[in-house]
Amino acid sequence: MSKIKGVIFDLDNTLLDFMKMKEFAVKAAVKGMIEAGLLVDEESSYDEIVSIYEQYGWENQKVFDVFIEKQIGYVEHKFLAAGIVAYRRAREANLMAYPNVNKTLMALAKSGIKLGVVSDAPSREAWMRIYYLNLYHYFDVVITFD
């Protein structure tokens, strides 16, 4: 019987709850834009932003630009900044590894098994998540979308 030499993990929704983080972050962004004066319905705006993500990709960096332009005909930077700042704060507060991820990675690494991550996220975003979660020291290789 051959010994396992390596394990490869997906990042989003395997090591961390990406969709929960995204939900909280987008809802916070909508609230931030409303607090800045954008006159929109909170619930339908959340649904519309999710639809934009589904159309353009979950890692798209221009989603709020598209949303604001659809609402008022141009990108008002006051609303954009409010949305981005609220999004980032909520993202950081809700970016958490699933239970036992650290314990499992530590046990695998201590047993000499090489560990890797594969992600469909762009490199910068994947590495940001890995560092936010303090998991960077476990992985021998990280392979990303780009």
Regions picked out by a protein language model, each given a short descriptive name:
Residues 1-46:
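Active-site neighborhood of HAD-like aspartate-dependent phosphohydrolases
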Residues 44, 87-88:
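Short, Φ-rich (hydrophobic/aromatic) sequence segments
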Residues 35-40, 71-74, 134-138:
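Short helix-capping segments at alpha-helix termini
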Residues 40, 51-86:
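A metal-dependent, Asp-based hydrolase signature
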Residues 32, 67-68, 107, 129:
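Residues within well-ordered alpha helices
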Residues 24, 28, 48, 63-66, ...:
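Alpha-helical elements of Rossmann-like donor-binding domains used by nucleotide-donor carbohydrate transfer enzymes
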Residues 80-86, 92-96, 101-133, 139-146:
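Substrate-recognition element of Asp-dependent hydrolases with the DxDx(T/V) motif
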